[in-house]
Amino acid sequence: QLNDMPNALKGYSVYKISTPSLIGTTDGENKIMALVNELKTRDKVIIFIDEIHMLMGASSSNGPMDLANMFKEGLGRGTVKLIGATTVDEYERYILRDKAFVRRFERIDILEPTQEMCVEILMKTLPKIEVQTGVKLNYTDFIKENICKFIVNMTSEYKRVYEISSRYPDIALTVLRQAFSAALFDNSMEVRFRHIYEAIKSTKAVYPDVIKKELKVFKEEFKDELAEEGVVVEKPQ
């Protein structure tokens, strides 16, 4: 929320740095050097690097040194202020092996969102996916929210089966995006229930018959609202 932050961070600008742009080219080392030098001249700037573990093991042109090493001096002197994001697995596999790099950071564990929070995330992400794909989930917000709840509830089974590696909201977002992809491959400009069915089925954690049964229950529960929208209820193939 606005102003809901520590006073020490107020007034800072945050810039997201694309990890592939740093390590996916032959001049990644030069880009990092230019970035570090630029940060020395600026006050109250924080850079954010997602998938920061990818810098570990990405060699510089001078040898096997990780590109991550190029940030160490700036981090130690305070001229570089950096927030990095990664998963617990990647943190333990890559980041922890470089103790000097670890000492320059404070680890903050982000708790997995609840199912209710996950539904909110899906609802906020929907408009972006619609713009990106040109496909619409063409229902009222009430039905959209309940479709998101349905996806979250169904992916809870996926979470149970693959508990170690699967987390909210990623698994639910993946299913939502796959529903839009299924619509695109179906040459449809709108996401239908059959596309949601295909997306959930692709997880291979829920039997197709179970998905069909739950979709039938969903449609029955909201049949009046769907009828008002003129929705033609089709059976998944």
What does each model-identified segment do?
Residues 1-237:
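AAA+ P-loop NTPase nucleotide-binding core of proteostasis motors
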